[in-house]
Amino acid sequence: MTQVYFHRSNTKKVFLDHQGAVVNDLAEARDHATRLVQFFTNEHSLVDWRDWVLHVSDDQGDELFVVPFTFMLGKPH
């Protein structure tokens, strides 16, 4: 088990996750990251999420992987 953090950013803003989550492995971290991106993109707001990225880091601050929000949004119609 390891503590991972899910920071999100775009070209203008960075939001740091100070709480994080404990996960068993990278697959669980990926699933959690996917749920977070879905949560943010599904909320009713005026935010354009297309240039946002979720950065997943371990407790040492090393980036494990990134999830561009566009992966979850799909192609615009």
What kind of feature is each model-predicted range?
Residues 1, 40-47:
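Short linear motifs in intrinsically disordered
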Residues 1-16:
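Short aromatic-glycine-(Arg/Gly/Cys) micro-motifs in beta-strand/loop hairpins
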Residues 1-2, 24-30, 58-62:
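A short, structured loop/turn motif at beta-sheet edges
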Residues 2, 19, 50-52:
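A generic structural signal for short beta-strands and their flanking turns/coil linkers
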Residues 15-24:
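A short, exposed loop/beta-hairpin motif centered on an aromatic-Gly-Thr core
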Residues 20, 37-38, 71:
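Residues in and immediately flanking transmembrane alpha helices
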Residues 25-41:
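A short, charged, amphipathic alpha-helix used as a generic interaction element across diverse proteins
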Residues 45-77:
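C-terminal structural segments of small proteins and small subunits
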